[in-house]
Amino acid sequence: LELSSAASDVYKRQPPNILLTTPESLALLMSYPEAPSIFSSLKRIIVDEIHAITESKRGDQLFLAISNIRKYCLDAKIIGLSATVNDPSLIAGWLAPTNDCDIILSDPGLVPEISILTTSEPPPWAGAGGLYSIPEIITEIETHKTTLIFHNTRAQAEIFFHNLWLANSKNLPIAIHHGSLDKEQRNHVETAMVRGELRAVVCTGSLDLGIDWGSVDLVIQIGAPRQVKRLIQRIGRANHRHNGASKALIVPANRLEVLECFMALDAIYENKLDSELQTQIPLDVICQHLLLVACAGPFMPLDIFNEIRTIEKYKNFNREDFDQCLDFCISGGYALKKYNQWHRLIQTSNGAVKLRDPRIANRLRMNAGTIQDSDTLKVRYKSKRGKSKGSTIGEVEEAFAVSLTPGDTFLIGGRIVKFESLRERVVEVSPLSLRHISA
């Protein structure tokens, strides 16, 4: 849910029948005074890919928000969905702390076909690119309808795609997809996939979840998987239909990863998955939650404390820690007491807590969230004469951008570009050659 201010106002007055949203956006909706009217008619809360949410602070933010809005819709049912849960009873505790939760284990379907790719050249002793396997991967692409080639990092994906393109003597339509690319380019690749126009896509975690392209019949994982669950999710992108067995190949990036890849295969066939839950209570998320609740209006601390303790993970959350979080929001805590700008909340004579200055509500909302992104800069083609600006390619980390000098080259979006200048937090580049690497 990313709406303009005007559209958001309309939404708050007329909530939709079905809302697809994120933990961050749900927390923002909770922070508005209109929250009671928005959620009073709520009947179902569905948390898809719940295993991915419960592994991080995003899960804490989501269930803190749910604990707050449930008072507006006491009869609402919560449903969690996942194909890779190690301990369903633990996840059920997040959904229904009172143990009133039905666990439905569906038939996992056909056993996936997974193997280590056999290559004529052995993997190197060091390195993490998997470039040695490109001849065999080209053959696999030629013999399958559509192949997804997963990498663990964006940099590895860029290097692999470039070398794959150079080896693509038959000019098969291939593309690259990752989170640092411009949204227009990602949409272009996704549209081409829907139309069945691509034979292969080199990608990262941007295509891990929620991708149901019927043409995909092979998944290749380059490098040892960091999680068994993540590998299963990626494998599930192939033959994603009720009666289809997923097919996947794993390519160790180097010889040290061979053992890890075989261990991952054993874990899959023995149905041994990674654990889901982080047991430590993130006090920073509690503080953020208190600030967002205050944006919606005054609250009684005991009420919010009791709401929080309805979450399974927080059932033993003690009042002392809660009060310290509240004190931090009111006075800045022991470290920031002398700085008035950190005195966000105030407690009234009747014990209620509210914003010290209602004008800071929007600022608090804008800074809400638990995703820690590194500072990035836009990468744009240098403007041509008569044009105000060139087209945007994607983003790079600021630390990388400031290390460049004019004339340096790098890969982004499958293109080799030459660094020209850094202006107004925009990296200006020019194409290195007339050859354009794209879908």
Sequence positions of predicted segments:
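Single conserved hydrophobic/aromatic residue that forms the stacking wall/gate
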Residues: 1-7, 11, 434-439
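SF2 helicase catalytic motif II
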Residues: 24-27, 34-72
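Conserved helicase ATPase core of P-loop NTP-dependent helicases/translocases
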Residues: 181-203
